A protein has these predicted regions:
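C-terminal structural segment of proteins
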Residues: 1-128
Length: 128
């Protein structure tokens, strides 16, 4: 396979483990998200769907060329993650539509992520 498919309900902790062999820098940044307790419960789909302009996940995923897969009943559509974010607090998501999955290219060593913050975790935003 040339891409990695990540279900929207994948916790940040599980994502860190799964992504490390392919994108170690992204995995290292995930360790800086929130706290261990939050990473064990929070999902990557929720991180994206929330649409927060201070979220750490979307900048790294956009830099990786991620595709977002949305669903409403039996209707599915895909779009580049960068096209999902329209404006501050506004996403390209229709009523009843939810994030089903994210796919990213499987290539390795193409991204460097660094989180600049005063604290190791529970601080905001990253540079990718």
């Amino acid at each position: 396979a040339t891409e990695i498919r990540i279900g929207a309900m994948t916790t940040l902790s599980d994502l860190e483990t799964a992504i490390a062999p392919h994108h170690p820098s992204f995995a290292a940044m995930i360790r800086r998200y929130a706290s261990v307790q939050v990473r064990n419960a929070a999902t990557i789909g929720g991180n994206i769907a929330n649409g927060s302009p201070i979220g750490d996940g979307p900048p790294a995923l956009i830099a990786l060329g991620a595709t977002l897969h949305l669903r409403h009943g039996d209707t599915r559509r895909s779009l580049a993650l960068e096209d999902f974010f329209i404006d501050y607090g506004k996403q390209d998501r229709a009523a009843g539509e939810f994030v089903e999955a994210i796919t990213i290219p499987k290539q390795t060593d193409t991204l460097r992520c660094y989180k600049l913050s005063k604290r190791f975790d529970q601080d905001i935003s990253a540079v990718c």
